[in-house]
Amino acid sequence: MYIMKQSGWLELICGSMFSGKSEELIRRVKRATYAKQEVRVFKPVIDNRYSEAAVVSHNGTSMTSYAISSAADIWDHISESTDVVAVDEVQFFDQEIVEVLSSLADKGYRVIAAGLDMDFRGEPFGVVPNIMAIAESVTKLQAVCSVCGSPASRTQRLIDGKPASYDDPVILVGAAESYEARCRHHHEVPGKSKK
C-alpha cells in the first residue's frame, strides 16, 4: 500500500472465492481501528452464509457490519466523524454502489471494497469492473486450485459435485458446499462457447 497525501480514496480487493478478500478487508479495517479511526462496515443482506450481522471470512475471522439492501443505505449509517467505509461482497449490489463509493471517496472517506471480479462462468461480475476502473488501488488475490494446487483466479460452481452449466443463474449465495477455487486450466463451464 502506498501513502496517500490527500484524504478520500477507493481501494478494491478482488479475486476468486477462497482467495482471502473478506479476510484482507477485515485486516485493513482492524488496522484502521488500531489507528483510532472510526470505521463503518457494510455487506449486502443477500450474504447470509455465516452471519446476518457480520462480515465473516471462510476461515472464520469476523467483524460486525451493517447488512444493507441498497447502496444508498450506507449514508444512513455514517457521519462526519467516520473515517473509513468498508463494503464486502460488492458484486451483489447494483450500479448505484459505484456512484456511492465514488461519492464517499470524493467527500474524503477512505473506502475499502471487496468482491468477486469474475462470476462462476469466468466472466466479469456485475459492477466490480466499474469499481476497478475508478479505484486508486486494486489488489487482486488468488486462491489455490482445488485440482492441481496452482494459483487459482476462477470460481468453480458445483451442483451435486459437477460443474454448473453456463445457463445456471449467475447469483447463488454459497460457500464450500457449492464452490471451489480453480486455475484457468481446471475451470469448467459446460455450455460456454469456446472462442
Curated annotation (Swiss-Prot):
GO terms for molecular function: ATP binding; thymidine kinase activity; zinc ion binding. One of its GO terms (biological process) is DNA biosynthetic process. GO terms for cellular component: cytosol. ATP binds at G15, S16, M17, F18, S19, G20, K21, S22, D88, E89, V90, Q91. It is an enzyme of class 2 (transferase). It holds the Pfam family TK. The active site is at E89 (proton acceptor). Its EC number is 2.7.1.21. InterPro entries: P-loop_NTPase (IPR027417), Thymidine_kinase (IPR001267), Thymidine_kinase_CS (IPR020633). Its main location: cytoplasm. SUPFAM superfamilies: Glucocorticoid receptor-like (DNA-binding domain), P-loop containing nucleoside triphosphate hydrolases. Keywords: ATP-binding, Cytoplasm, DNA synthesis, Kinase, Metal-binding, Nucleotide-binding, Transferase, Zinc. Zn(2+) binds at C145, C148, C183, H186. It catalyses: thymidine + ATP = dTMP + ADP + H(+). It is found in: Cytoplasm. Belongs to the thymidine kinase family. NCBIfam families: PRK04296.1-1. Homotetramer. HAMAP family: Thymidine_kinase. This is Thymidine kinase.
